[in-house]
Amino acid sequence: MSFTTQVKEEILNLDSADKNELSAIIKMSGSLGLADKKLSLSIITENAKIARHIYALLERLYRINPEIKYHHKTNLRKNRVYTVFLDDNVEQILADLQLSDSFFGIETGIEQQILSDDNAGRSYLKGAFLSTGSIRDPESGKYQLEIFSVYLDHAEDLAKLMQKFMLDTKVIEHKHGAVTYLQKAEDIMDFLIIIGSMEGMEAFENIKVMRETRNDVNRTSNAETANIAKTINASIKTINNINKIKETVGLESLPIELQRIAQIRAAHPDFSIQQIADSLAVPLTKSGVNHRLRKINKIAEDL
């Protein structure tokens, strides 16, 4: 099950019957037609649970029993498309929801009453997300929440509504409509809270934290690996120089404080600078050990 489906199923289980939610669903997924010389309304979805939810909203809010039809997508036997259809009291329902325009169509923008009322806005956003919303799987590490609108003015009104809740919302126009979207993880989590998806928010946050933790571990591991490689390369260079000194003038030619450093390094190629310092009879700092190793390398290079 996709992350989007998980969120939608969670908010479908919330016990609510709000006209503003239904308004968003009709505006974004509905179309008008004529049936037996009467105005008809068809609301289309690919999710059976959303279709049943729309049916329940219409039944509870307007005491009507619409019809649910379905058909298969062309060549995709497993993908059903559901239509919630009604041809009774359509004009009255649209008028009550303030959706009808003067040309017997559906208004494309968002009513000012919804834009100015937080509770109405939350319900509208819930309906909008159920209709055409999607969230990119947070496991991908690229965060995005999108809501598609057929009309640009609706997408822009939707952005204004989301911005009221302090969300950094953007709109992009496409050939067949416009998308209102969020790209910041914190904004997406806030949006999930707004529409009532607390479990979705927690799941999103957990995935985000786990990804960040894994990335931190990987960065630390990469840094440690690089440091180990650097230490080994430096160790090999110094050991080669110690062998050069041994074969030409002998280690006994070195000052006594360098001889012991050379012996430890040659005997323990894998030792860190701190481990070499800890192996000395006379305590020495890491910088002191480094200084002596540089001296040994310089002596070998001058031979």
UniProtKB/Swiss-Prot annotation:
HAMAP family: HTH_type_WhiA. The keyword Phosphoprotein does not apply. Involved in cell division and chromosome segregation. This is Probable cell division protein WhiA. Residues 272-303 bind DNA. GO terms for molecular function: DNA binding. Keywords: Cell cycle, Cell division, DNA-binding. Coiled coil: none annotated. GO terms for biological process: cell division; regulation of sporulation. InterPro entries: Homing_endonucl (IPR027434), Sporu_reg_WhiA_N_dom (IPR018478), Sporulation_regulator_WhiA (IPR003802), Sporulation_regulator_WhiA_C (IPR023054), WhiA_LAGLIDADG_dom (IPR039518). It comes from Streptococcus mutans serotype c (strain ATCC 700610 / UA159). It comes from the Bacteria. Belongs to the WhiA family.
